[in-house]
Every structure is written in structure tokens, then in C-alpha cells.
Amino acid sequence: FRATTVPVGEDQEPMIEQAREIVRRFNFIYGDTLVEPEILLPDNAACLRLPGTDGKAKMSKSLGNCIYLSDTADEIQKKVKSMYTDPDHLRVQDPGKIEGNTVFTYLDAFCRPEHFERYLPDYPSLEELKAHYQRGGLGDMKVKGFLNNIMQETLEPIRNRRKEFE
């Protein structure tokens, strides 16, 4: 598809660098034929290495803890609902932990201020949502529902564009 930029996570940089080496060598031998791909890393530090939906170190196809760009809306909703949160946050009134909570890691990566206006107008910011969760009185399902809305909005244009090429 003549891509010049490849969006990757930090763990994929070596593979792209290897491809760049091959392109340089190929072009040296056969003339300027191939485009050397540029690496595009996310600006947001939370996106550099997203954990798997089960809270494990990273997404893994073999562990089944990935959200794919090709997932349907129902598949994404199911995966978000099953995401790892704070195991000690058993009731809505219990205080919850943010650190290590996969749902909040994904919110850090994907949430933008305009999402609150559309999907959670009672909260002005992600910081306020986190503070309420830590105080108690905010359930996991409400936070997961918010994340699901964000993921659907983010991935829908990608899914639609992908369908054009299938």
C-alpha cells in the first residue's frame, strides 16, 4: 500500500529497523525502488505498551488478551467488560486502586476531554473520575462502559476503512 510511516509500539522498533536495513541494502543494489519506512511511536506514554485485557504484561494473541482493530463492536464490548480491574474493589462503595487497573491504563491511552461531554458529563476530567474511583462510590461497570464507548468511537472509523479493502 506504499506506506511511508509505520505506527508501532516500542517493542516492535527492532523489526522496523531490520526492515529499514533490508530496504537500504535493496536500494543500494537495485536503485531507489523501495521506500524506507519511518517509525511512528505514540505521543501518549500510556500507548507505548498497553497491557493485555487481563492485566498481563502485554497483549498476546496466544493468551487471547488482545483488542484487535478488526474486532466487531460486540467483541470489543465483551473484552472491555472482562478487563482486569482492582480485585479488592468488590462493591461500588469500596475505594478502588488506579495503579495496575487495566481499565484506567486504557483510559489514560485513549480518553480525550470531549469524551466526558459525550459519554460521562458528570465528570469534568479523567483526574476527577480517578479521584472518585479511589474514594469509592464509582463502580467498575460504569467505568468500563465509559471505556467501551471510547473504544467503539476510536475503532469504528478504522473498521469501516478496513472493510473497504476486504
What is the predicted role of each segment?
Residues 14, 20-166:
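Conserved nucleotide- and phosphate/pyrophosphate-binding catalytic cores
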